[in-house]
Amino acid sequence: MTILNHTLGFPRVGLRRELKKAQESYWAGNSTREELLTVGRELRARHWDQQKQAGIDLLPVGDFAWYDHVLTTSLLLGNVPPRHQNKDGSVDIDTLFRIGRGRAPTGEPAAAAEMTKWFNTNYHYMVPEFVKGQQFKLTWTQLLEEVDEALALSHNVKPVLLGPVTYLWLGKVKGEQFDRLSLLNDILPVYQQVLAELAKRGIEWVQIDEPALVLELPQAWLDAYKPAYDALQGQVKLLLTTYFEGVTPNLDTITALPVQGLHVDLVHGKDNVVELHKRLPSDWLLSAGLINGRNVWRADLTEKYAQIKDIVGKRDLWVASSCSLLHSPIDLSVETRLDAEVKSWFAFALQKCHELALLRDALNSGDTAALAEWSAPIQARRHSTRVHNPAVEKRLAAITAQDSQRANVYEVRAEAQRARFKLPAWPTTTIGSFPQTTEIRTLRLDFKKGNLDANNYRTGIAEHIKQAIVEQERLGLDVLVHGEAERNDMVEYFGEHLDGFVFTQNGWVQSYGSRCVKPPIVIGDISRPAPITVEWAKYAQSLTDKPVKGMLTGPVTILCWSFPREDVSRETIAKQIALALRDEVADLEAAGIGIIQIDEPALREGLPLRRSDWDAYLQWGVEAFRINAAVAKDDTQIHTHMCYCEFNDIMDSIAALDADVITIETSRSDMELLESFEEFDYPNEIGPGVYDIHSPNVPSVEWIEALLKKAAKRIPAERLWVNPDCGLKTRGWPETRAALANMVQAAQNLRRG
C-alpha cells in the first residue's frame, strides 16, 4: 500500500499577480482575449510543473478560475442569469465576467451577481442564482479543456469538481420562492456527462468537493446526498472531499455513499483519524488533510507523522493539504526582507508541497530523520523572545470583568454626550475614509520607497487631512473624520504599528476576481510600542470646532484579516489586540478626541461554521471589543461600524458590544435590515447607511429623505444618525461631494419637519 500525496488546489493568481494584471488589462481594453487566455495557460502549466517539481504525485486540474470556481461551476451547468446572457445564447469568458463584475468588454452591462464569503475564509464566491423550472446543460467546458492541457503535458491528473449538493446549498432563489434542492435531479445529468467525458480521457480519480458536509445541514439536505451519489457512481473513482471542519457528526450519511474515497481536514476538524479509519468502509481510500492550506506556518512534520502512522498499511492512504492552497501565498523563497529566523517559521504553497513530499516519503520508508530536521525551527520558535512577551502575557492574565464594562449604562452616557457635543437632530457623519486619490497613493509609495523624507511626507499628509476637514465643513457635516490619507489598508496600517506582526513583499492571496490581499502575519504577543492614530486625529481636531472622530480597526477584524498564530487561541490574539488598542482609546481621549469609532466589519464573518460553536466565539469576540472600548469616559462617544447582510441571528451580541452608536450598511436592502433592530428593540443609537458607496451613482435628496423616514418608522428619530453605507476610499471626489451634499440637505429638511 504505497502512500501518495496530492493538493486540493493551488493559488491561481501567479507569484507576481500575473492573472490580476492580465484580467485588468483585458477589462480596460488594453489587451485581447487571446492574450488573456495565453496568460491563463502559462500560469496553469507553471503551477502544475512547480507542484510536480516539489514532489506532488496527483496534480489538481480544474482549480484554476478566471474569476471564481463557483462561478465556473455555474457556467459549466449553463446557469447564466438572463440579464447576463449573450443574445445568441452562447457562453464565453465575457459572460463569466459580466456575472462576476457586471460588465465585460462585450455585451450589455447588468447588475453583478451577489458575492459572499466562501465558508469561513477571506475568499469570496459569486452566489449562484436559481429560478423555478430552470434548465441546465453542459455549456462551459473549461474543466475538460484544462484536463486535456494537463494530459498533453504528461501529468498525473486529478480533476477537481464542486459537488452538486454543495453547489445548490451555496446558491439563492430569485423571483418566485421554491426549494432550490428540488433542482438536484435537473443538474445531475450534467454532472454525469462531465464524469463520462473524464472517464473517456482515462481519468481514474475525481476530487468532488462537498464542503457542505461539515455543516449542521437540515435533514432534507443530508438525505439528498445518497440519491445524488447513486446517480454519479460508476464512471470514475470519486474522492468525496470536505474541508474547514470535521466530518464526524455527518459520518453516517457519508459512509452510506457509493464513493471510493474520503478527504478529511485534520487541521481544522476535530476528527480522530483512528476512529475515522474504523468507521469508514474498508475498501475506501482515506485522504488525510494534514498540512494547513489556509495559513503560512511551517508544519511540525514529526507531529503529523505521529498523527497518521497508526493507520499506515491498514487501508489505502493519501496525504494532502487540508483544503486548497488557494488561501496561502505562493512561494516563501522570494521573500527577501524577512530575517532568517522568522522566515524559518513559515511555509507558503510551494513549501507546503515540499512538506507533503517529506511526509509521504517518511510514511513509506519509516525514516523520520528528514521530518525532525524540517521541524527543528518550530522547536526553536517555542522559546523565542520574538514570540513571547511576559508583560503582555501578565497583563492578559490580569483582565477582570470590570475591564470590559463602561463606567455607566448607555442612558447615563448619552446624557453626558448630548451635553458635551450638542449635536442637532439627525446628526450627519461619514464612516471614516475619503477618496484615496492618485496623489495620496503616490505620496505614500514614495515615502515607503525612500524617495521622500519624513518631513515632506508628513507635510503632504497634513495637507490632505486639512483638505478633508475643509470639504466636510463646507458640506455642513456635523461629526467629521480626518479622511485616513495616511492609511493603505485598515488592518495593515495597525499591524505595522503593533509589535507582534510581520509583513511580506509578495504574500498575496486572492480575495475575489482580480482583487488580492496581503494579510499581516501574527508571529508573537501583540503590544503597542507607541500611539498610532493620535497625532493625526489631534491635528485634524485642531483645524475645526466640530468633533472629529478617532478611527480604529477593532480587534476581531484585525484578527480575522490576518494570518493568526497557531500556538495560542484566536481568543488570546483578539484580547491582546484589544488591550493594545485600549491604550490607543485612552490616548485619543487624553488628546481631546471625544468620539472614537472602532470598526468591526469582520465580527459576523468570524463565526464558526457550526452554529453550536457560535456562543463561545461571540462571547470572547464581544468581550474583546468591550475591553478595547471600556476605558472611555461617559462623555466619550464610542461608535462601531459593521457591514453585514444579516443581523437577526447575532442581535444579542451586537447589543452586548454596548457601543453608543452603530453604523450599518442598509441602503441596498432598502432599510429592511433595520427590522432586526426594531424587533430586538435595540437600545442605543443607529446610523443606517443611506446610500451605497460601491456605486458611483449620486442619490437624490428625495431618495435619502424617503429612506430616513422609513428608518424612523422602525427606530425613534432621536436615536438615528445619517451616514453613507461605508468608507469613501474607492470613490472619486466629484461624486463624493455631490452625494454628501444631498445627504446633508436631506437631514436638514427632516430637522425642519
UniProtKB/Swiss-Prot annotation:
Binds 1 zinc ion per subunit. It comes from the Bacteria. Pfam families: Meth_synt_1 (PF08267), Meth_synt_2 (PF01717). Its cofactor is Zn(2+). Transmembrane segments: none annotated. CDD domains: CIMS_C_terminal_like, CIMS_N_terminal_like. Gene3D superfamilies: 3.20.20.210. Zn(2+) binds at H641, C643, E665, C726. The keyword tRNA processing does not apply. Its EC number is 2.1.1.14. GO terms for molecular function: 5-methyltetrahydropteroyltriglutamate-homocysteine S-methyltransferase activity; zinc ion binding. Keywords: Amino-acid biosynthesis, Metal-binding, Methionine biosynthesis, Methyltransferase, Repeat, Transferase, Zinc. It catalyses: 5-methyltetrahydropteroyltri-L-glutamate + L-homocysteine = tetrahydropteroyltri-L-glutamate + L-methionine. This is 5-methyltetrahydropteroyltriglutamate--homocysteine methyltransferase. The gene is metE.
